[in-house]
């Protein structure tokens, strides 16, 4: 939920935490909302009787949304889904047109692909990634960087990257391997190390970024502290913990500042009991929608 009350994709919360920004509903562009606005404009006669089409009308709306959301020196645009998905074609076309309008030298295309590892044959399979990149080139977009997601904690041999570089036409330094890490806060460190030369060339700034705070975050998340705190989270939507991800991540950061380890104990807002509240060190009562669980939240606040 953004500061202006919009319910958006979970990814927007990651951007807020990692970039230390407050985002709004303008930063989340949804096809359904754009189509609704297009239909409303057509019904109001704003197109003068023209036939409203995905190209150019929807693509123009997407480009306008990108411009309206842009407020910084660097603007990050993420297109969800998979290359070739029918529902995402208008967004791919819009971003192609966008790069031509602002200048190709001002755009850096990053394509994330998945390279599976087959345990039976003990080899990485790059064919799905090659096909995805061929599809992307077919839409008129040549990636500058290919981020290769793989399973396991070790990166594939360099031969895999070389194979992808040859098949895609991307420079070898533009192929970055992204294996699993034990904490998400190590990802910026990995990207800065692997992608530094490409970003320096793109931005014209070869000054190495100060990654001290990221190193501290990664160290905190990997470290085990002796002092432990149990926080009771009185929640309505306990079936999906990601609903409260911003809160749980904030609690972790607060605990790290006090060199402590935090354990989240989920308490159903509809079945709050004194016994459940008595076992925790502190209670957090987050916001919610509707009447369900309100009495339990009030009871939890009263207990404290």
Feature locations, PLM:
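Flexible phosphate-sensing "switch/lid" loops adjacent to ATP/NTP-binding sites
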Residues: 1-263, 270-282, 288-290, 296-303
